[in-house]
């Protein structure tokens, strides 16, 4: 009986890992993206992994969100609840995205604009209470502030995104550094 329970746990873990491995990475978009996300907090929600229609349902929902420019983002559902947790109920991650050329991007207070790393997956380090990911990421993002373009990076969202190395199960996380303030193009 004990070995049967252990086998069930192992099989379930393998299915979850394989599902994560099969997630296609977010495609790079030419130019810059200006986005407003409906639901930024994320974590591990197992239900969408086992629902073959979850992506299709989210795409349908996101079409009705705010405007026709709204798109389903990232190929996953985000959990209802605080970021960094495990949730059994999920909502779709709908983002309004517009392609704009870099000089036209203006800072909008309180809005996510351009992210250096859009890959999102299961990153275990930031879940651990003894790992001060916020401090580490704030320092990392501050180091990027000497950009010649005048972009100002800020640590965004209180979480880490996985390092992009193809698709796979990520243990190490990279900081999600976002440009929050961008110098406006000088009017001439």
From Swiss-Prot:
Compartment(s) where it occurs, according to its Swiss-Prot or TrEMBL record: Secreted
UniProt-listed GO biological process terms: defense response to fungus; killing of cells of another organism
Signal peptide: 1-28
Disulfide bonds, paired cysteine numbers: 37-95, 45-77, 58-92, 62-94, 123-178, 137-175, 141-177
Keyword S-adenosyl-L-methionine: no
Coiled coil stretches, renumbered: none
GO cellular component terms, semicolon-separated: extracellular region
Main location: secreted
UniProt keyword terms in alphabetical order: Antimicrobial, Disulfide bond, Fungicide, Plant defense, Secreted, Signal
Source species, domain of life: Eukaryota
Statement: the UniProt record of this protein carries the keyword Disulfide bond: yes
Protein family: Belongs to the DEFL family.
Protein name: Defensin-like protein 99
Source organism: Arabidopsis thaliana
